[in-house]
C-alpha cells in the first residue's frame, strides 16, 4: 500500500480472495500516524462457478477495552507461509507512550502487519502493527480504524489518483500530529530537579524514555 501511495503510477493494489482470484482495488484514505489505510476492492465478479451470486463476508469492528489477561487472536501471513492465527494475551493500552497501542503478548512476525486481531466473538479489536520480539507485540486499537472508515464517503473520489494529492494528505496529517505533540510538550510547567547548586528540567512527558 505504501508503494502505491508514494508512486501510484508505478504500483497498483489488488485484493486476493480465499480461492486465489484477484480483484483490482484502490486506496481511499490513509491514517499515516497509525499506519492504517482504507482499501476498496472492485465488486466481486458476477457469478461464481457454481452459478450462485457471490456473497462477500466481512469482519465486524468491536472495541479494544478489555481486562488484562483476556485471550485474543492475531491473524496474518507470517513470512508468506500462509494465513495463520496466533493466540496471545491482551495486556492493555500503553499509557506511557506517545501513541496509544495495545500491548499483545504473542508472536507477530513479518507478513502479519495490517492483519486483524480478534476477540473470541470474531470481532476486530486491533490491527497488527509491529513487534519487539520475544512475544512482545503491538496492535493499533480498532477505534482508529473506525474513525478513518467514518471519514470515507459512500462514493469517494480516490486520492490515489494523484501522487501530489497523497503527499498533501500525508503532510496535513503529520503537521497536525506534530502540532499536538509540541503543544503537549510546551503547555505544562516543567518540573525542575535540583542537582547540586543547579536546577535542571525534570521529566517533560512520561512518553520520553532514557533507555
Residue locations for each model-derived region?
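C-terminal cap/linker of serine protease catalytic domains
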Residues: 25, 47, 127-195
Amino acid at each position: 500500500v505504501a508503494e502505491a501511495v508514494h508512486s501510484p503510477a508505478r504500483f497498483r493494489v489488488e485484493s486476493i480472495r480465499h480461492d486465489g482470484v484477484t480483484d483490482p482495488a484502490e486506496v481511499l484514505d490513509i491514517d499515516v500516524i497509525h499506519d492504517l489505510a482504507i482499501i476498496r476492492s472492485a465488486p466481486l465478479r458476477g457469478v461464481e462457478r457454481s452459478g450462485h451470486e457471490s456473497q462477500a463476508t466481512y469482519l465486524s469492528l468491536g472495541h479494544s477495552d478489555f481486562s488484562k489477561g483476556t485471550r485474543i487472536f492475531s491473524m496474518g501471513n507470517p513470512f508468506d507461509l500462509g494465513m495463520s492465527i496466533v493466540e496471545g494475551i491482551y495486556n492493555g493500552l500503553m499509557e506511557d507512550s506517545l501513541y496509544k497501542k495495545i500491548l499483545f503478548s504473542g508472536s507477530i512476525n513479518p507478513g502479519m502487519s495490517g492483519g486483524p486481531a480478534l476477540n473470541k466473538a470474531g470481532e476486530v479489536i486491533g490491527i497488527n502493527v509491529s513487534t519487539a520480539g520475544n512475544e512482545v507485540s503491538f496492535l493499533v486499537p480498532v477505534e482508529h480504524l473506525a474513525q478513518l472508515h467514518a471519514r470515507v464517503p459512500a462514493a469517494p473520489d480516490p486520492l490515489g489518483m494523484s501522487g501530489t494529492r497523497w503527499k498533501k494528505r500525508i503532510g496535513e496529517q503529520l503537521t497536525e500530529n506534530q502540532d499536538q505533540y509540541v503543544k503537549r510538550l510546551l503547555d505544562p510547567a516543567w518540573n525542575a530537579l535540583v542537582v547540586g547548586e543547579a536546577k535542571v528540567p525534570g521529566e517533560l512527558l512520561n512518553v520520553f524514555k532514557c533507555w
